[in-house]
């Protein structure tokens, strides 16, 4: 399971050091794609396969489904972790997520999310994070 929050610096070549716990779960090669909320999603090859199977079931007659699939798959790339534990974030993905100098890498169960520092701090101060609202949503979900 992928959990935790880590802050890292992006080097001049657009690389970040992937936390060792995440490298263990993701493997030497993994898929990085555009995520929701202007962050990036990273999946192990195994989890990507599971996700693909679910997404294959979306109705191609649905414009929204086709748009989502294009967004999700066109932005995807296979990344490789080098011997120093670094991974290159492609320029188009850095631009999409607003990544410049520093990033937050978080674990969300079966995926990682890579956030620009600015976007992550905004997300964490968002009014949606009130304890009462979260508690209410958890109750609605049966948690």
UniProtKB/Swiss-Prot annotation:
Keywords from the named record: Cytoplasm, DNA-binding, Repeat, Transcription, Transcription regulation
Record text on subunit structure and interactions: Forms oligomers.
A Pfam family this chain is assigned to: MraZ
Domain SpoVT-AbrB: start-end pairs: 5-47, 76-119
GO cellular component: cytoplasm; nucleoid
Organism expressing this protein natively: Caldicellulosiruptor bescii (strain ATCC BAA-1888 / DSM 6725 / KCTC 15123 / Z-1320)
Gene Ontology MF terms in the entry: DNA-binding transcription factor activity; transcription cis-regulatory region binding
Annotated gene: mraZ
InterPro entries in UniProt: MraZ, MraZ_C, MraZ_dom, MraZ_N, MraZ_sf, SpoVT-AbrB_dom, SpoVT-AbrB_sf
Domain of life: Bacteria
GO biological process: negative regulation of DNA-templated transcription initiation
Lineage: Bacteria, Bacillati, Bacillota, Bacillota incertae sedis, Caldicellulosiruptorales
Name of the protein described by the UniProt record: Transcriptional regulator MraZ
Localization per record: Cytoplasm, Nucleoid
Family: Belongs to the MraZ family.
């Amino acid at each position: 399971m992928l959990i935790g929050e880590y802050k890292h610096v992006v080097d001049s070549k657009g690389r970040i050091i992937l936390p060792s716990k995440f490298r263990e779960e993701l493997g030497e090669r993994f898929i990085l794609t555009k995520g929701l909320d202007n962050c990036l999603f990273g999946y192990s090859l195994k989890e990507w396969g599971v996700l693909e199977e679910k997404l294959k079931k979306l109705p191609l007659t649905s414009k929204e489904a086709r748009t989502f699939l294009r967004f999700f798959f066109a932005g995807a790339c296979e990344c490789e972790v080098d011997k120093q534990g670094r991974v290159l974030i492609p320029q188009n993905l850095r631009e999409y997520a607003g990544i410049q100098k520093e990033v937050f890498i978080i674990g969300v169960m079966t995926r990682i999310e890579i956030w620009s520092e600015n976007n992550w701090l905004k997300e964490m101060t968002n009014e949606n994070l009130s304890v009462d609202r979260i508690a209410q949503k958890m109750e609605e979900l049966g948690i």
